[in-house]
Structures are given as C-alpha cells and as structure tokens.
UniProtKB/Swiss-Prot annotation:
Name of the encoding gene: gatB
Keyword Protein biosynthesis part of the UniProt annotation: yes
Assembly mode: Heterotrimer of A, B and C subunits.
Protein name, UniProt field: Aspartyl/glutamyl-tRNA(Asn/Gln) amidotransferase subunit B
Disulfide bonds: none
Listed GO MF terms: asparaginyl-tRNA synthase (glutamine-hydrolyzing) activity; ATP binding; glutaminyl-tRNA synthase (glutamine-hydrolyzing) activity
C-alpha cells in the first residue's frame, strides 16, 4: 500500500496562479526517540532513591551532582530492566556494551556531560507492530537501538523572573528507544508511543506516568515531495519533549504542514540547510511548533568513553534467564483472549491494560464456567470499585476465585443479576464467600417449576378480579400478576419461568 498523499500547491501556499495548481504527491517521514524512566529503587549510578516528587534537591549526592572525586557505580537493576525492555521490543541484546560521556552545558546538568551509550548500545535491531483505531493497516516499525542513559535535572521558571533548578531527577535511569524513520503519519507516531508505553508498563519496567514525564517522545519529522517528475526532501525537524499522545499527534500534523508551506514559499532547501537539523518545541496553547535552536552536530557533543565506568559484559545465560521473565506480551494476550475465551475486542483491550489485571482476570476465568460473564462483571463492577477507591486490583478485598464463584451462581440461575450486585457489595464489605451469603440469607433463586406453579395458583386465588380483567381484554394484568408472584417469592423466583407459567395459567382460563 502506497504511503503517498496528494495535495495542490494553492491549498498549501495560498497561491492564486493557476500554473501552480498542479497536484503533487508527498510522503510523511517520522522517526521517534522515546525516553523512558525505569522503575528501579535507586538512581542509575548512585544509591539515591529513584522516586518522583518530594522536596526539591532532597534526593541528591556527590555522584548525581557531579562533585569532584565522586565515582559512579552502575546499578544491576538498571541493566536488568534495560535488557528486559529490549527483549520485549524484539531487540538483539549485545553481550558487550559501553558507557560514554555526551557533553553539553545546561543549567540542570551539573556534571557538564550526560552518561549515555553512543556507539556500543545495549540493544539493537528490534521491531514492534503498531495498529491504531484510525490506522487503515498495521505498521511494523523497526527499532534501531535502545541505549542506557541518565536523566538531567529540572529547571523551574517562576513568576519572579528567576529560574530554579531541582536536581532530584539528575541520574534517574532512562532508556532511549530510537526507531527507524518508518512512521508515515502523525497518527502512526502517536500510536507508536502508545504501543511502546503499553508494552513497557505491561512488563513492569516503567510506570509510564505521562504527566510526570516518565515517558517522553522526540519526533524527527520531514517530508518527501514528488512534483513534476522531481523528488525533494524538506530538512528534518526534531520536536522535543512531548509527553502525551495528543501532543505527538498535533505537533507532527502541524510540522508536516509547516514544512510543506515553507517548501512552496522558499523552494527546495540548500545542501547546507539539509544538513542542519532544527530542534523545535510544541506550543499547545497556540498550536504551533517553535524553533528552539539549530541542532548540534555529533562532533559538538564531544562523545568519549566514560573512564569511570567499566564496559558491560553480559552472559548468554543471564539474557536467557531474563527472557523468561518477559512473558506473554499484551498483543498476544489480547489475541488469545478473543480467540480462546470469545471476548470482544474492547474487553480484551481493557483487560490487558496491565499484567496484574490480565493475570487476575485469567485466574477468575479459569475458575468459572463462563469467561465472558466474568469479563463483563470485571469491566462493569470490579473496575468501578477499583477506580472509585483508587487502588490496584490486587488490593481488592476479593480473590479472582471469589468472583468466579459469584458468576457461576448467576450462570447456574441460583441467583439473579440484581441479587449478584447486592451479594458483591456484601463480599467487598465482609470478605465472605458468595455461597455463604446466599445460604445464610436464603437468596438461592427458586427454579423448581412445581414450586413456582404453586405460587402462581396462590396469587390467582388471591386476586380473582385481576383474572376477570384479563378475561375482559386487559392484557397488562399479566405483568401485574407476575410482579405479585415475584413479591410472594421475595424476589427468588426465576423471572423467565414465572412469566411462562403465568401465561400458561392465563391461557387456560
């Protein structure tokens, strides 16, 4: 399928000359760099706690502040999570990799350099399949590399015209996931970020908190233009530090149109302009990208091996062991839930929102007679409680097997759906089993036809006027009589069987 899109010169540049109104074709080219904070207990190269929030500059030490004489020590947990991320994204894990210093001067980078990996990254040659709601086809996106690096501090620009720096984030462990330029629309770029977040949160290497910057995306955008038999490319712009899917989608959409407009207004870029990569920021208020600076060349960063850190040497056995911990990924689990358990696409998508939720559901489904009934109950009732209490499902005062028992009682028609809701509330409050509550309160649904028929006859005997009304054509009496039978059974009678027996008895009058 072709990724070329069509446009006309006047629609882009506002031209009025009809000679410029010929159609042209263009292809959007996007590659993403995703920075992901890892869920380690400590920072990457020191023993400071790796937590968000807290008092500014309360979790720092000589190592993350870059004080003279302080030596970094790489965290094994950091490397382990990096390897697991690489395995989940289909990468080859390099048994040898090395750390480098990337030099640049920002106020929030106290060492004057960032510890990263330059030409010897931990992971290479991966790929993920991206499929969004608004994407017509699935796209395979190649991952060029994943490397380890540390985060910088945070600059806070206050209303008093001063800038303040919080170094708590200095040294927080990151991986940078670099894709090949395989994305062909802003929608695909947003879906790629979403897919990466879904996979990495599912295997629990990151919490993926977008608001706190645990996952940030830089998008490299340019356009290939075919016009009157000639091919042109616009210079690459890198849009930095986007922390939401909408931001990625909106920024890339705008940048593509901006580059097309610039091309028609100024003509093809010179060789010098093509070599200069522009760094852009996204202004969500104005809805525009803004030039921040012209990108440094690699030479400007003065990469060098970090003499304070030894090279990383991994064994095949170590990598093999970690591969077992990755487990089944969300896409595969969704497909299995739909194929084997008959779940809808929506149910499968929601229930694979986290590994904890997927595991919890699967335990309940295996213990129950009807996996779809269990899935629907979790989606409608269980998650409502989880969200209301702002807890994870593991903190719920119920086991998966307890929900399975409750659903089987509905499946076997021992209780109604309405009764199940009341019993569920009692289970949450007391921790009691569904069967114990049903037995103690005499809630078991009455399904025996002879017993229900006896109730019907009793109601008929008590309400002869209703029977005469029925004989005179008042058909709504049937519903009223059903209600009386249900009332006499204290709601325990099976509604469908009550309806059948009432209509049978009325037809014999």
């Amino acid at each position: 399928m072709s990724d070329l899109q069509t446009g006309t010169v006047p629609s882009i540049a506002g031209a009025t000359d009809d000679t410029h109104a010929a159609p042209f074709f263009y292809e959007v080219i996007i590659g993403c760099e995703i920075h992901c904070q890892l869920l380690t207990k400590t920072k990457a190269f020191c023993a400071c706690a790796n937590r968000s929030g807290g008092m500014p500059n309360s979790r720092v030490c000589p190592v993350c502040l870059g004080l003279p004489g302080a030596l970094p020590v790489v965290s094994e947990e950091y490397v382990r999570l990096g390897v697991r991320a690489g395995l989940a994204l289909g990468c080859t894990i390099q048994l040898w990799s090395a750390f480098d210093r990337k030099h640049y001067f920002y106020p929030d980078l106290p060492k004057g350099y960032q510890i990263t990996q330059y030409d010897a990254p931990l992971c290479t040659d991966g790929a993920v399949d991206v499929q969004g709601v608004d994407m017509p086809v699935q796209r395979r996106v190649r991952i060029e590399r994943i490397h380890l690096e540390e985060d910088a501090g945070k600059s806070l620009h206050a209303a008093d015209a001063y800038s303040y720096i919080d170094f708590n984030r200095c040294g927080v462990p990151l991986i940078e996931i670099v894709s090949r330029p395989d994305l062909r629309s802003a929608e695909e770029a947003a879906c790629f970020m979403q897919t990466i977040r879904e996979i990495l949160t599912f295997i629990e290497v990151t919490d993926g908190n977008l608001e706190e910057g645990a996952l940030r995306c830089d998008a490299n955008v340019n356009v290939r233009i075919l016009y009157k038999g000639q091919e042109h490319h616009t210079p690459i712009s890198e849009i930095k530090n986007m922390n939401s899917y909408r931001m990625v989608r909106d920024a890339c959409t705008y940048e593509v149109q901006r580059q097309l407009q610039e091309f028609w207004q100024k003509g093809p870029a010179s060789k010098e302009e093509m070599q200069r990569k522009r760094t852009m920021g996204w202004d969500p208020v104005e809805g525009v990208t803004l030039l921040q600076r012209t990108k440094h060349s690699l030479r400007d960063y003065r990469f060098m091996r970090d003499p304070d850190l030894p090279d990383l040497h991994l064994t095949p056995a170590y990598v093999q062991h970690l591969s077992y911990t990755v487990g089944e990924l969300p896409a595969a689990r969704r497909a299995r839930f739909k194929l084997d358990l008959g779940l809808s696409a929506f149910a499968a998508q929601t229930l694979t929102g986290s590994r904890m939720l997927a595991d919890w559901f699967e335990k309940a489904a295996h213990a129950s007679k009807n996996a779809r009934r269990v899935a629907n109950w979790i989606l409608s009732e269980v998650l409502a409680v989880v969200n209301e209490k702002n807890i994870c499902i593991a903190e719920l005062n119920l086991s998966p097997e307890a929900i399975a028992e409750l659903m089987d009682a509905v499946e076997d028609q021992r209780i109604t759906g309405k009764q199940a809701k009341d019993i569920f509330a009692q289970m949450l409050a007391t921790g009691a089993r569904a069967q114990d509550i049903i037995s103690a309160q005499g809630l078991a649904q009455l399904s025996d036809e002879e017993e229900i028929a006896t109730l019907v006859q009793t109601v008929f005997q008590e309400h002869p006027k209703a029977l005469r009304d029925w004989q005179h054509g008042k058909t709504n009496v049937a519903a009223w009589l059903m209600g009386q039978v249900m009332k006499r059974s204290r709601g325990r009678a099976h509604p469908a069987r009550v309806a059948t027996l009432v209509h049978q008895a009325l037809s014999q009058l």
